């Protein structure tokens, strides 16, 4: 399948470009296999850098016409927790792939204040490139009818209550999510 990519004059992909490309690719797959209309994603990490992949993938799949569910378990619950969702941070310690304007030794990244600095840098870089915020991606996911499923066992283990999560979250255990995943043609663990 041929996809129109950005021209040299416009070298950055926008969120709309990504959604269009994914929609075209998924439409091609669905045309070949009409049963391939479901996606299941597991979000198990709750830092700013790990919140983006499951939400971008989920909204792209839903925008392409796929029934999509994201299962938030363990620290992934932070993404949908009312108190934590707006305060997600990225930790540069032990993250050698994290792009920094100036290479820094691990000792420097462990200094007080570096987590806040790295988080601010990531948010500003994403904003400069018109990448939606986590709050916006969550709103988009709900508008696109993505099922946001909080792991009930993890909620119980961590001592949370269902009231502590954003509106629109369903609560279920791993067995219920496995039923969703079993019927899905795309299953991702992020």
Kindly give the residue locations of the regions a language model identified.
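Heptad-repeat coiled-coil amphipathic alpha-helices that mediate oligomerization/assembly
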Residues: 14-34
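Short, glycine-rich nucleotide/cofactor-binding loops
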Residues: 41-51, 125-128
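Histidine-anchored nucleotide/phosphate-binding helix
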Residues: 52-65, 70
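Short internal beta-strands
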Residues: 68-74, 151-152
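Glycine-rich loop at the start of a catalytic domain that most often binds anionic cofactors/ligands
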Residues: 80-89
